[in-house]
C-alpha cells in the first residue's frame, strides 16, 4: 500500500481497518503474522480484517458450532467474545440452531458462510472467496453510492465540529 505523504492524514478506512486489526490482536487471540504476511501485506479494504483472515483460510471452515471450542469460534466472522461464550455455555443444555444463535448475538449476515448447526449450513452457499466477498459487500450498492456521491468529499469530524474545545 502507498503511504500517505508527510503531513496528510491516512485514509479513514485504512485507519479504521488498523483499529479493527488491533482489536483482533488484543481480544481475539490473533497474532500479527496471521493477519498479514509477506505474500499478502495489505488488508482487503472491502471487508474487515477478521473476515479477510477467514476468507484466506477457507480450508478451516465451515465450523460446527456444536463442537468447536471457544478459540475457534472467536475466529468466525460475526461471532465475538460474548457470543462465543454464550454458544459454549448453551451447548450444555441442548443442540443449537440458527434462530438461537441470532438470539445469542451472532451476526448471521457474516457468520452463516463460516458455520454449521447440526451439520447443516443456514443456506446452501458455496464456500468460495469471491462469492462470499460479493455477498458481503453488495458491490452493486457500493458502486451506485460512489456514483451518486462522486463529487462529495468526507472527512473525520473533530470535537470542534460539536463546539467542544
Region annotations inferred by a language model:
Residues 42-72, 98-165:
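C-terminal extensions
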Residues 90-91:
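Residue-level signature of tetratricopeptide-repeat
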Residues 95:
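Adenosine-cofactor binding site in Rossmann-like domains, unifying the SAM/SAH pocket
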Residues 1-63, 67-71, 77:
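C-terminal scaffold of the Radical SAM
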Amino acid at each position: 500500500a502507498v503511504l500517505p505523504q508527510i503531513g496528510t492524514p491516512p485514509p479513514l478506512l485504512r485507519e479504521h481497518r488498523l483499529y479493527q486489526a488491533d482489536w483482533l490482536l488484543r481480544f481475539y487471540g490473533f497474532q500479527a503474522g496471521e493477519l498479514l504476511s509477506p505474500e499478502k501485506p495489505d488488508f482487503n479494504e472491502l471487508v474487515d480484517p477478521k473476515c479477510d483472515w477467514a476468507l484466506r483460510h477457507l480450508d478451516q471452515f465451515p465450523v460446527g458450532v456444536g463442537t468447536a471450542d471457544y478459540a475457534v469460534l472467536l475466529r468466525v466472522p460475526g461471532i465475538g467474545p460474548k457470543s462465543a461464550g454464550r454458544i459454549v455455555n448453551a451447548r450444555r443444555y441442548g443442540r443449537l440452531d440458527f434462530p438461537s444463535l441470532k438470539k445469542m448475538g451472532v451476526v448471521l449476515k457474516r457468520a452463516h458462510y463460516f458455520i454449521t448447526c447440526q451439520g447443516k449450513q443456514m443456506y446452501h452457499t458455496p464456500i468460495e472467496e469471491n462469492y462470499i466477498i460479493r455477498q458481503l459487500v453488495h458491490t452493486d450498492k457500493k458502486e451506485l453510492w460512489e456514483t451518486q456521491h462522486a463529487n462529495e468529499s468526507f472527512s473525520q469530524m473533530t470535537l470542534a465540529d460539536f463546539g467542544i474545545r
